[in-house]
């Protein structure tokens, strides 16, 4: 696990009181007026009960996650869990199929002013993150990207995923390419793609995300189906 990180940085540690898991954390200092600094997990979230890719019954009283190839090794060795959007946002499973706040099965909107899309950038939604932390939002992702002097996104990516690129993990953020699920049939693109949830709806069944790879720069507001399993990073509330 030590190979995932940048040894030139001093990492903190957070113990999730819900299950005792330990996460390395890092204080990023982008220097933005709106986000001068923030503390983030330097690992993908790995909280919840593992379910199989072909699962058809779900329990809204628990956080449920996928592990790549249905193998818990991936969850437990830095790649973390893969979560549907509803699980990542702490919402009922029905919210993967409708706009939040529009049906009795998904009664609570994560942001009542959803028509004003720019206002979603700063949302702090706890979701599957521990109390006092929230799912990393678009403003935080953009601020972190602004710290990348390589201008290609590699400074956010662990050398385990970025290979021998000299700019890899210059921010200490240590992103891994954990792949994703394309429900209902397959896990895809491990070690090729890292896709992270944003608290931002796009359509009834789709949402916006952050995508990174070795081939392209970071893409903000990519569109994925809410049912697809993606990674989550948590940021401490401020």
What positions do the PLM features span?
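Conserved positions within compact, well-structured domain cores
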Residues: 1-238
